[in-house]
Amino acid sequence: MRVKKKNTTGNARNFVTRSQAVRKLQISLADFRRLCIFKGIYPREPRNKKKANKGSTAPTTFYYYKDIQYLQHEPVLAKFREHKTFAKKLTRALGRGEVSSAKKLEENKSHYKLDHIIKERYPSFADALRDLDDALNMLFLFANLPATDQVSTRVTKDAQELCNQWLALIARERLVRKVFVSIKGVYYQANVRGEEVRWLVPYKFPENIPSDVDFRIMLTFLEFYSTLLHFVLYKLYTDNGLVYPPKLDIKKNKLIGGISAYILESKDAPFLSSVDGSADSENQEVQVLDKKALRHAMKADDKAGSEADEGDADSNEQVTNIELDDFEDKNKNHGDILEQPSQYDSPTSTLFSEFVFYIGREVPVDILEFLIVSCGGSVISEAALDQADAANVDVSKVTHQLVDRPVVKNKVAGRTYIQPQWVFDSINKGELVPANLYLPGESLPPHLSPWGDSVGYDPAAELAEEEAESEEEEEVSDEAEGDEEATLAAEEDEEDEAEAEELRAQKELELEAQGVTYSEAADSAAPSKKASKQKKRKTEEEEEKDLKLIMMSNKQRKLFKKMKYSNQQKEQEIETLKQKKKQIAKTKAKLKKLEN
């Protein structure tokens, strides 16, 4: 019989340590990390670490052997090796003082592309959209970061450009479905080609970058995610008949910026249109000139036509004019007219289509402009009125003014003054919320997450509970009326009990005649009575639960216990929130008393 070698089968064969993988690929550890991030390969946990590490118990990171074999044929790996040789040549040239040769080396430096990796990892467009959440979160994070030694200005500008291109397309196609304003930032959810894409946009506050963050890994992820978003944006823009990348209005970008600065050019249309539907000023002038030229040409044609008619008048005298018969439709009942399907399938897409919003200085324009435009509304910001072209803006069409101040002094007639939360709650509900709850200076209703738990805390449910309690109190009053009838029934029960006592006395006499004491008979009957009472206490549902628990496997039983524990924790959290709400209500009541 042939003796098997140790560590050649099983875990020892299927897994490779990180140091072995780096040695096999002949690259540095930093390049190995980058390659794993690009290809989507991550460390694995073997069942038996000792066997996988060939008898050693030292803490190590493991990878699948097949994954490392897969990396050996990667074109980017060859580019990493080329870059390594380039770095050696460059340091040698700079050490010798050969500046011209160093410049030539820099110009002829090899660059790698991640296009083929994107196509490998995302074979369909739906797969790319499903994995877009993390990409957008990373890009919006870097777009709001300040430029430092670790993060260059080029990186932040590229991230800002990509983010604005994404927002401009989402706003134009009206794809926003949900929004939630939290402490971390603003969460958005859009429906893109049937896929729900959710991302977080941080607030534009100065960021304090922690020192323990490894920006090398984050920048590698950013490089991959930016390539992915380029692919997705190109596909979405071209499918909607738009030119990618969109053109940028430099004047608007300097003054206001945001999505209104991007001009989305259609491939078929002869002019450019911005995200909010307003045409570019230069293109409007071109259109006016074209119309003038058209009028002159039409006048010239009319003159030429009249001269030709005068010359041919003699020949046309003999020609008789033939009038066509008019055919009337005798059927007066035209039937039901079918409504044409709307371009937008969601009610939120046309929620603000009839409104013009005026945004004050104290309100964040970038957040509300994106939401209002994506719901079909128009926006006029107070900051935009400071521009030179402010005279062309018609403020008389404003229907709603967003205010984040306690008191508005000079109110304009015909406008509805509301707080910004009205926009968020209307989008989440899919319909216009009553504006009287969101007036300036009013205490706002709770802004709840649209993705909240069904078991979670719902302040609106508390109102229903209070109503139920009031109904119960009414029932109690009705029960009090029926107490009189109950007293009559109690008197009858007392008579029955007296008869039962007489029967017991007779039984005692019979047992004494047989030679058995009554106390012994009572003791023997007591446990059976207790058991019957306990059985009665247990409901049918509890018995079913017990049976199910008995039939469960050990794994299922543990999972059930975990679920039970998590439900108990949720209930405790709900109770704490209710108590907090009560305390806040008490403090508010005390403050009102002090004010009065």
Curated annotation (Swiss-Prot):
Record field: compositional bias (Low complexity) = 519-529
Q: Name one GO cellular component term.
A: preribosome, large subunit precursor
Q: Where in the cell is it found?
A: Nucleus, Nucleolus; Nucleus, Nucleoplasm
Chaperone as a keyword of this entry, yes or no, is no
Query: What does the record list as coiled-coil region(s)?
Result: 460-596
Cross-referenced Pfam families, in alphabetical order? BRCT_2, Pescadillo_N
Question: From start to end residue, where is composition biased (Basic and acidic residues)?
Answer: 501-510
Question: Would you kindly state one Gene Ontology biological process term found in this protein's UniProt entry?
Answer: maturation of LSU-rRNA from tricistronic rRNA transcript (SSU-rRNA, 5.8S rRNA, LSU-rRNA)
Family statement drawn from the similarity comment of this UniProt entry: Belongs to the pescadillo family.
Subunit description? Component of the NOP7 complex, composed of ERB1, NOP7 and YTM1. The complex is held together by ERB1, which interacts with NOP7 via its N-terminal domain and with YTM1 via a high-affinity interaction between the seven-bladed beta-propeller domains of the 2 proteins. The NOP7 complex associates with the 66S pre-ribosome.
Q: What does this protein do?
A: Component of the NOP7 complex, which is required for maturation of the 25S and 5.8S ribosomal RNAs and formation of the 60S ribosome.
Protein name (Swiss-Prot/TrEMBL): Pescadillo homolog
**Species whose genome carries this gene:** Eremothecium gossypii (strain ATCC 10895 / CBS 109.51 / FGSC 9923 / NRRL Y-1056) (Yeast)
